[in-house]
């Protein structure tokens, strides 16, 4: 496994610990809410939650912001644009767009674990326009064509 060093900046509203892996094989690191006052997300509502951190990703890396499964299954709280993408050239505060799909209001307190961040390497491509594509068994079948 390759370890890549990434610069992280604690902002004025930061509190708690830096994102870290919970176990040896965790893919994601928990992001912590850095809101000054509690934020209530009403049922069906979306809120932007600050984390108090900014990062400088190396070229060809992105950060993916994903839901925490416990918040989703227990409270209906998930990341609205999942996965959210943080590009390598973004230097502002990481914020998480949460939506409450549950039936009850939910309060985000400062220091609460609100999402996971996965750091991933990616490749860029160059389009090669073509009048035909190679045939596959699946062909153009989609949206349930391989079974439910």
UniProtKB/Swiss-Prot annotation:
Residues bound to substrate are 68-70, 81, 85-87, 95
EC number(s) reported in the record: 3.6.1.23
The cross-references to Pfam families, in alphabetical order and at most eight, read:
dUTPase (PF00692)
Record's catalysed reaction(s): dUTP + H2O = dUMP + diphosphate + H(+)
What EC class is this?
hydrolase
Q: Which GO terms describe its biological process?
A: dUMP biosynthetic process; dUTP catabolic process
Instruction: Name its co-factor(s).
Output: Mg(2+)
At the top level of its lineage, which domain of life is listed?
Bacteria
Keyword terms, alphabetized: Hydrolase, Magnesium, Metal-binding, Nucleotide metabolism
This protein's pathway reads:
Pyrimidine metabolism; dUMP biosynthesis; dUMP from dCTP (dUTP route): step 2/2
CDD domains from the UniProt entry: trimeric_dUTPase (cd07557)
Q: Which InterPro entries match?
A: dUTPase, dUTPase-like, dUTPase-like_sf, dUTPase_trimeric
User: What are the protein's GO molecular function terms?
Assistant: dUTP diphosphatase activity; magnesium ion binding
Query: What NCBIfam families does UniProt report for this protein, alphabetically?
Result: dut, PRK00601.1
- Say which family it is in: Belongs to the dUTPase family.
- This protein is called what? Deoxyuridine 5'-triphosphate nucleotidohydrolase
Ranked from the top, the taxonomy reads:
Bacteria, Pseudomonadati, Pseudomonadota, Alphaproteobacteria, Rickettsiales
């Amino acid at each position: 496994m390759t370890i890549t060093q990434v610069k992280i900046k604690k902002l004025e509203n930061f509190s708690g610990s830096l994102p870290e892996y919970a176990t040896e094989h965790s893919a994601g690191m928990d992001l912590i809410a850095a809101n000054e006052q509690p934020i209530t997300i009403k049922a069906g509502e979306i809120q932007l939650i600050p984390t108090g951190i900014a990062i400088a990703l190396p070229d060809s890396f992105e950060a993916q912001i994903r839901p925490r499964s416990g918040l989703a299954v227990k409270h209906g709280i998930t990341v609205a644009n999942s996965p959210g993408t943080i590009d390598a050239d973004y230097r502002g505060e990481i914020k998480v767009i949460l939506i409450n799909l549950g039936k009850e209001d939910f309060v985000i307190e400062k220091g609460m674990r609100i999402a996971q961040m996965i750091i991933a390497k990616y490749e860029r491509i160059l389009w090669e326009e073509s009048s035909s594509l190679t045939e596959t068994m699946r062909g153009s079948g989609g949206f349930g064509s391989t079974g439910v």
